[in-house]
UniProtKB/Swiss-Prot annotation:
It comes from Thauera aromatica. Heterotetramer composed of A, B, C, and D subunits. Keywords: Aromatic hydrocarbons catabolism, ATP-binding, Flavoprotein, Iron, Iron-sulfur, Metal-binding, Nucleotide-binding, Oxidoreductase. The keyword ATP-binding applies. GO terms for molecular function: ATP binding; benzoyl-CoA reductase activity; iron-sulfur cluster binding; metal ion binding. PANTHER family: 2-HYDROXYGLUTARYL-COA DEHYDRATASE, D-COMPONENT-RELATED, SUBUNIT OF OXYGEN-SENSITIVE 2-HYDROXYISOCAPROYL-COA DEHYDRATASE. Gene3D superfamilies: 1.20.1270.370, 3.40.50.11890, 3.40.50.11900. It is an enzyme of class 1 (oxidoreductase). Catalyzes the anaerobic reduction of benzoyl-CoA and 3-hydroxybenzoyl-CoA to form cyclohexa-1,5-diene-1-carbonyl-CoA and 3-hydroxycyclohexa-1,5-diene-1-carbonyl-CoA, respectively. The enzyme also reduces other benzoyl-CoA analogs with small substituents at the aromatic ring. This is Benzoyl-CoA reductase subunit C. The keyword Iron-sulfur applies. Its EC number is 1.3.7.8, 1.3.99.n1.
């Protein structure tokens, strides 16, 4: 199977706002249930161990007209909650049995309450995370939070989630994280062979497919990508930062690369890479998931940094690891976490002589020429003067 065949399948999944693949998975067995989740991170291992399908919801993108969703939020709020409400009210998510709202920002917290009011018969949970990273404080708190989620899913499914089932799920998601890192690593080494639009669509597919199917898709893509013959261009190597929640249109990603930039790392859909290393399968699986969050999770604006000096360390590590020549801060309009963190990260870049530019977008942005011109000018300036 060629990379083109695989990406064609991924693009069809990306454009399908009725989530047909997830619907078909559920219809194949009447006992199956689907648990949807918003960005940035949820422990999908627990959902999987319950025999359920985790379904990532990234809003409606540029393919959904928002009609009812605008009535729920003010004009100065980002678009993803509006389009998510539209997905719900238009019955595109009527097959979903539950919805998780991770701790991202006040808007998503409020959306969880709205969802409870709009869909009273559904399982809805706001999933909180610790802001203290001591094992005996934040660790105990987060383990209790995980166990509450476990109990809620047990009640919904009518069956116990055993420790052995959790360990098996951790193992399959460890494999998924490894394969995702392999794809990102290949793109970083040879970005001319692995277009960022391909990587993006591969990751989007992983939000709607069973993890086992996604693992095979990633293996197939890696096997095909190494055989690709593509011409290396004199492009600038950049990192995208700030796009961890509301997603950019696919054309925006393509426009950045067409402007003369190779995207060598990003924070799109970081649920796939939120935990940097394997989660242990020995001992208590809930405690292992808790400790992995405390000590192995990446830094993002949606996660609390308990030490000021840690702010920007992860971004600078990305720059070094990927031999990046610049950073593009691309955040959704009105995204409080990303836009509040941006000046701090920009200061770290300036202190370390890392060039950067910034712009804002919405998931339905249509005019790409200004962004392409800005990114192209940035790439040219790095080639000429960096």
């Amino acid at each position: 199977m060629s990379t083109a065949d695989i990406i064609a399948r991924c693009e069809a999944l990306y454009e399908d706002l009725d989530f047909t693949a997830a619907r078909q998975w559920k219809e194949a067995d009447p006992s199956r249930k689907v648990i949807a989740y918003m960005p940035v991170y949820v422990p999908r291992e627990i959902i999987h161990a319950a025999g359920m399908l985790p379904l990532g919801i990234m809003g409606g993108g540029d393919g959904l007209e928002v009609i009812h969703g605008d009535a729920f939020y003010q004009s100065y709020i980002c678009r993803i909650p509006r389009s998510t409400i539209e997905l719900g009210l238009s019955k595109r998510m009527d097959f979903v049995d539950g919805m998780l709202f991770p701790s991202i920002c006040d808007v998503i917290r409020n959306l969880s309450g709205m969802w409870k009011l709009m869909f009273p018969g559904k399982y809805v949970r706001y999933f909180d995370v610790p802001q203290n990273y001591r094992d005996d404080v934040g660790g105990n708190y987060y383990t209790a939070e995980l166990n509450e989620l476990r109990e809620g899913l047990e009640h919904l499914s009518g069956r116990k989630i055993t420790d052995d089932a959790l360990r098996a799920s951790i193992k399959v998601y460890n494999e998924n994280r490894k394969l995702v890192q392999d794809v990102y690593g290949l793109r970083s080494r040879e970005p001319w062979k692995v277009p960022s639009a391909d990587v993006y669509l591969l990751m989007r597919a992983g939000l709607v497919l069973p993890v086992e199917e996604h693992n095979q898709m990633l293996k197939d893509y890696l096997a095909a990508a190494v055989k690709v013959e593509a011409q290396k261009r004199d492009n600038c190597r950049v990192i995208i930062n700030g796009s961890f929640c509301e997603q950019p249109p696919l054309n925006l990603i393509k426009s950045i690369e067409l402007s003369g930039c190779y995207i060598v790392d990003d924070d799109y859909m970081i649920v796939h890479r939120f935990l940097r290393n394997e989660v242990s399968t020995a001992g208590d699986p809930m405690q292992n998931l808790s400790l992995a969050f405390l000590h192995e999770s990446i830094s993002t604006a949606a996660k609390y940094d308990d030490k000021e000096e840690d702010k920007g360390k992860y971004l600078l590590e990305q720059v070094r690891t990927n031999a990046a020549e610049g950073v593009i801060f691309a955040a959704p309009s009105f995204c409080d976490p990303a836009l509040l963190e941006r000046p701090m990260l920009a200061d770290r870049c300036s202190e370390n002589k890392v060039p950067y530019i910034s712009f804002k977008y919405a998931e339905n942005s249509g005019q790409m020429q200004p962004i392409r011109e800005q990114a192209g000018t940035f790439a040219d300036s790095i080639k000429l003067w960096s």
